[in-house]
C-alpha cells in the first residue's frame, strides 16, 4: 500500500510540474483547468460544441488540456491553412491513443514518413486513381441499382411503412467498398456485425477517454476493470473480424481487388501481416462511414426543404429522363445535385473534428507556440459554419455553390470534409462519385416525404468520431419511374 501511495504521489507531482512548464510558454489561451484532469470534465459529448463555445470566448486558436495532454484547437479557415498547409510538415504526425489506432502500422494512424508515403501511394494507385475509379464504375452503378430495387420491393409491400434510409445506405456503402477492397460483399449478418463494431468503437465510454489522455490514470488503469474489459472485448471482436476477412481472401478470389495487391507485396516481404490487416480495416471503415452519413444528412435537409428537393428532381428529369436509371456519366451534367452534396458536406462534415494531428517539433501558429508533442485539432464544423466565411451559415442553401465554384477536396480551407495537406483523404474523388450517384438515384427514382411533420425531423448529432444523425431518418417513398426499371 505504501508503494502504491508513493507511486501515485510521484506521478501526480510529475504531471503537475509538466503542466507548469508548459503553461509558462506562449501557448494559446483557453478555459480554466482542474488539476490532473485539465478540461476533460468540461467537455460535452459533442466535443466540437465545447471547442466552438470556448473559441467564442478565447479566440480562434485555443489550448485545451485533455488530462495531461495539451491540445491546440483551431476554428478559423486562416488558421486551418497555417496548420494544414504552411506548417503541415511539422504538424502532420498522428496523435495515437491505446484504442483503434493499429499501433500506427496502417495508413490513417501512422506518423508521416517513409511508411506513410509508401502506403498512401499504394492505396492511391490501386483504389483511388482516376483510372481505378473509372474501372469500377459499373460495379458502383450495379450496387446502387440493387439498393433502389430493395427500397422499391420493401415499400411496395407496405407503402405506408416508413423507409429507414440508414439501413439501405449502410448496406450500399459497405457493399461498394468491400467489393473494391476484398472482392466480395458481406453476408447480411456479417455486415451487421461489422457496422456494430465500427459504431461501438467510435463511441467509447467516457472513462476510456480519461484513460487515453490522463497519464496517471493510464498507469493505474487496473482500477478501471470494466472499461479495460470493454476495450479488450472490442479489440477481440475487431481482430476476429479482420482475421475472418483475411481468411476469405486467402481462400482465393476470382475478382481482382485491393487486398490481392497487398498480399502480393506481403509475399515479397514488403508489408507485414499487421499492415495488411490495418489497411483493409482503414479502407472498409472510412469509406463506408463517409458515404452513408453524408447521404442521410442530405436527404434529411431536402425533406425539410421540399423546394430544393424538387429543383434537384427537375434537373435529374431533364438530364436522365424517365426511361433509364442514373449513371456515373451523368454526374458532370448535374451541377445542382453536386451543390446539394457540397452543402450537406459543409453543414454536416462526416468527421466534424479532424482526426488529431501531432506536432513533431515546436511551431508558431496564429502567433502562439504549439509545443512539440502537442495534439492539434481542426474544428471542421466550426469553420464550415463561420459567418466570416458564409452568409446565413446555419441554413441549408445549396445555391451558394452555384454562385462561387468551391473545392471540397482540400484546396478551399473554408470547407474541409476530406481534410487537406499531407493528410488529405486520398479517396475524396471516389467518395464524391459514390455519394453523388447514390443520392441522385434516390431522388430520381423516388418521391420522398416525411413520416412526421417536417419541422419535427430530429437533426441532433450523435456523439462520436463520425457524425451520424442521432435518430435515423425515416421517410415515405413512392416511385417516380416506370415499374420495369425497378425490377
Swiss-Prot record:
Cofactor or coenzyme needed: heme
Compartmental location: Membrane
Class of the enzyme per the UniProt entry, highest EC level: oxidoreductase
InterPro entries, A to Z: Cyt_P450, Cyt_P450_CS, Cyt_P450_E_grp-I, Cyt_P450_sf
Gene3D superfamilies for the chain: Cytochrome P450
Entry membrane topology: Single-pass membrane protein
Known EC number: 1.14.-.-
Residue intervals passing through the bilayer: 1-21
This protein's record includes keyword Iron: yes
A single MF term (Gene Ontology): dicoumaroyl monocaffeoyl spermidine meta-hydroxylase activity
Tissue: Strongly expressed in root tips, inflorescence tips, young flower buds, stamen, tapetum and pollen. Detected in aging vasculature.
Keywords: Heme, Iron, Membrane, Metal-binding, Monooxygenase, Oxidoreductase, Transmembrane, Transmembrane helix
Residues that, per the record, bind heme: 425
Main location class: membrane
GO biological process assignments: spermidine metabolic process
GO cellular component: membrane
Annotated function: Acts redundantly with CYP98A8 as tricoumaroylspermidine meta-hydroxylase. Involved in phenolamide synthesis, but a recombinant CYP98A9 is unable to hydroxylate triferuloylspermidine. Unable to use 5-O-(4-coumaroyl) D-quinate or 5-O-(4-coumaroyl) shikimate as substrates.
Family classification: Belongs to the cytochrome P450 family.
Name of the molecule in the record: Cytochrome P450 98A9
Gene it is expressed from: CYP98A9
Amino acid at each position: 500500500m505504501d508503494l502504491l501511495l508513493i507511486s501515485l504521489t510521484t506521478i501526480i507531482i510529475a504531471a503537475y510540474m509538466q503542466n507548469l512548464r508548459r503553461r509558462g510558454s506562449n501557448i494559446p489561451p483557453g478555459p480554466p483547468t482542474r488539476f490532473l484532469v485539465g478540461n476533460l470534465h468540461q467537455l460535452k459529448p459533442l466535443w466540437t460544441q465545447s471547442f466552438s463555445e470556448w473559441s467564442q470566448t478565447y479566440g480562434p486558436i485555443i489550448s485545451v488540456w485533455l488530462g495531461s495532454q495539451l491540445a491546440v484547437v483551431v476554428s478559423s479557415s486562416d488558421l486551418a491553412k497555417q496548420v494544414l498547409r504552411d506548417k503541415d510538415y511539422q504538424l502532420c504526425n498522428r496523435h495515437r491513443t491505446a484504442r483503434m489506432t493499429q499501433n500506427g502500422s496502417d495508413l490513417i494512424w501512422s506518423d508521416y514518413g517513409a511508411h506513410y508515403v509508401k502506403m498512401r501511394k499504394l492505396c492511391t494507385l490501386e483504389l483511388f486513381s482516376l483510372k481505378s475509379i473509372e474501372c469500377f464504375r459499373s460495379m458502383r452503378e450495379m450496387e446502387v441499382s440493387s439498393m433502389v430495387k430493395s427500397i422499391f420491393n420493401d415499400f411496395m409491400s407496405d407503402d405506408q411503412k416508413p423507409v429507414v434510409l440508414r439501413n439501405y445506405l449502410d448496406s450500399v456503402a459497405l457493399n461498394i467498398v468491400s467489393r473494391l477492397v476484398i472482392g466480395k460483399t458481406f453476408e447480411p449478418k456479417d455486415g451487421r456485425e461489422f457496422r456494430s463494431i465500427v459504431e461501438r468503437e467510435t463511441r467509447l465510454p467516457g472513462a476510456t477517454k480519461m484513460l487515453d489522455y490522463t497519464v496517471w490514470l493510464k498507469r493505474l488503469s487496473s482500477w478501471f476493470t470494466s472499461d479495460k474489459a470493454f476495450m479488450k472485448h472490442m479489440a477481440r471482436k475487431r481482430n476476429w473480424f479482420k482475421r475472418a476477412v483475411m481468411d476469405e481472401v486467402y481462400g482465393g478470389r476470382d475478382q481482382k481487388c485491393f487486398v490481392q495487391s497487398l498480399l502480393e507485396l506481403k509475399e515479397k516481404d514488403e508489408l507485414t501481416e499487421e499492415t495488411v490487416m490495418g489497411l483493409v480495416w482503414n479502407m472498409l471503415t472510412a469509406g463506408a462511414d463517409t458515404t452513408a452519413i453524408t447521404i442521410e444528412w442530405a436527404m434529411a435537409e431536402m425533406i425539410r426543404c421540399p423546394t430544393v428537393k424538387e429543383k434537384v428532381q427537375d434537373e435529374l428529369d431533364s438530364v436522365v429522363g424517365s426511361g433509364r436509371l442514373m449513371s456515373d456519366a451523368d454526374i458532370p451534367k448535374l451541377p445542382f445535385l453536386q451543390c446539394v452534396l457540397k452543402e450537406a458536406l459543409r453543414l454536416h462534415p462526416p468527421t466534424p473534428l479532424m482526426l488529431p494531428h501531432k506536432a513533431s517539433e515546436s511551431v508558431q501558429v496564429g502567433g502562439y507556440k504549439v509545443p512539440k508533442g502537442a495534439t492539434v485539432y481542426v474544428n471542421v464544423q466550426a469553420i464550415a459554419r463561420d459567418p466570416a466565411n458564409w452568409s446565413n451559415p446555419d441554413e441549408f442553401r445549396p445555391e451558394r455553390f452555384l454562385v462561387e465554384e468551391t473545392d471540397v477536396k482540400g484546396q478551399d480551407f473554408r470547407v474541409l470534409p476530406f481534410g487537406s495537406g499531407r493528410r488529405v483523404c486520398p479517396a475524396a474523388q471516389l467518395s464524391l462519385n459514390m455519394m453523388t450517384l447514390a443520392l441522385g438515384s434516390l431522388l430520381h427514382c423516388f418521391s420522398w416525404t416525411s413520416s412526421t411533420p417536417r419541422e419535427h425531423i430530429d437533426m441532433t448529432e450523435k456523439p462520436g468520431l463520425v457524425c451520424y444523425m442521432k435518430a435515423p431518418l425515416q421517410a415515405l417513398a413512392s416511385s417516380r419511374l416506370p415499374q420495369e426499371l425497378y425490377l
